[in-house]
Amino acid sequence: MENLENSTDCKETVSPLNNSGSILNSTVSRHEAMGFVLVHAGAGYHSESKAKEYKHVCKRACQRAVDRLRAGGLALEAVTAALLELEDSPFTNAGTGSNLNISGEIECDASIMDGKSLNYGAVGALSGIKNPVLVARRLLSETQKGKLSAGRIPPCFLVGKGAEQWAVSHGIPACPTEKMTTKFSLSGYKRNKRKMELAEQVETKRRKQSSENDFGCLEPVGDIMVEGEENNSACLDTVGAVVVDREGNVAAAVSSGGLAMKHPGRVGQAAHYGCGCWAENARDVSLYSTAVSTSGSGEHLIRTMLARECSTAMQTENAHQALLEAMQNKFISSPFLAGEDCVLGGVIVLRCCSCGEAQRSEDIQALLDLRRTGESQHNTDCYVTVGVYAPNICICQPMFKTLHKGRTSGCAQLNHQTSGVSMEPYYREHVCGVHVCPGQ
C-alpha cells in the first residue's frame, strides 16, 4: 500500500479514451473508514503547453484534502484545503493568476456548501483577497453561530468592497491586485486589450462607411475573445472540488476569476446559490447524499441552476443515465438557453449512500464520464483529477481530454473498483463528470 505522496506520478498518456480499465484494485480491512476527493481545474481554454502544471496542481489539491481527512477532518475542511491549493496556483483562473477585468483588476467569485448543515457561503466580485474561498468559508461558519446583535441575520453572500471589508475585519489579510497578477494573466490582458481597441476601430470605420454609403445593417466584427494559437489566457474555467468524509458528510466548493475582460462588478455562477456548487447529505436512508461543482460560462450556468439540477437528478437509481439526461434536458436543451448558439458547461458530481449490512461486501465503484456532444466552436479542454482516499490506499489519477474543433460526439468512460473496502456504515460512491459544448 502507498500514500498519496508516494503514489504513481501523473502520466501524460492517461485519457478516458485509452484507459477504461481498473486503476485500483486492493483490499482494506472492513473496519477502516475512508473518504473520497474529486477536484477539477475547469472546463475552459487551457494551454497544452501547461498540461503538466495543471495536472500537478490538481494532484497537490487532492493531497491537501487527503491530509485533512487523514487528520480526522470533515468534508468541509477537506474541500476548503483543496480549493486553497487551486487558488494559490498561478496556472488556474482562481485567486492568484485570475483573469483581469476590463479595468485591469482582479475580481473573484467563490462559494462553498456544507452538506451536513446545508449552510452556504459566497463572495462575488471580490478584490484584494488572495483566497476568496476562505471568505466564503468564514461566511458559512458565521451563519452557523446564529443571529447577530439586535437580532440581525448574518450574511451568507457578500460582494465587492463590502466583501473585502468584511474579510479584513474577520482576520483575513488583504492582498493587492498587483501581487495576485501573474505575467501570464497580465500578458493575456494586454493582448485582449489590443484586440478590443482594434475591434472598436474597425467598427467605427464600418459605421462611418455604412452611414456614408447607406449600406444598412453592419456585418458583425466577430468574437475578439476567440482563442488564437498565441492566446491561452481566455479561460472560462471555474476550479472546484467535491468531498465525502469518513462519516458520510459531503461538501462542495468552487472558485473563479471569471471571464477575461469582464465588466467590473460582474458575478459569475461560482458565487450563486445552486449554480456553482451544491452539497446535501441524505436526510433519509432511501436518498443519496450528493456534492456538485460546475464550470463553464457563468451566465449559462446561472440561468439553468445546473448544480442543484444535477443534484436532484442524482436521486434516481441510474446515476449515469440521470446525469446525462439532466445535462441534455436541463442544460443543452434548456428553454432558458434557447437563444444561445453554443452553451458551455461542465460538472463533476459525487453521490454516496449509506448501505445496509448485506451490501457491505460489494465493491466501491466510481464512474467518471466525460461526454461531449454537438459542434464545438472552440478548442475546449477539460482537466479533471480523481483522488481516491482510504487510510492505506490513496491514488491520484489525472485525466486530460481536449475537445477539438468540429463535430464530436460519443461517450468515454473510466471505471475503477476497490474490492472489499467497507465502512461503519458502508458507503458507495458514484462520481460523474460531464463537459458539454454543443453548437446550433
What are these regions (language model features)?
Residues 2-440:
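Alpha/propeptide regions of enzymes that mature by internal proteolysis
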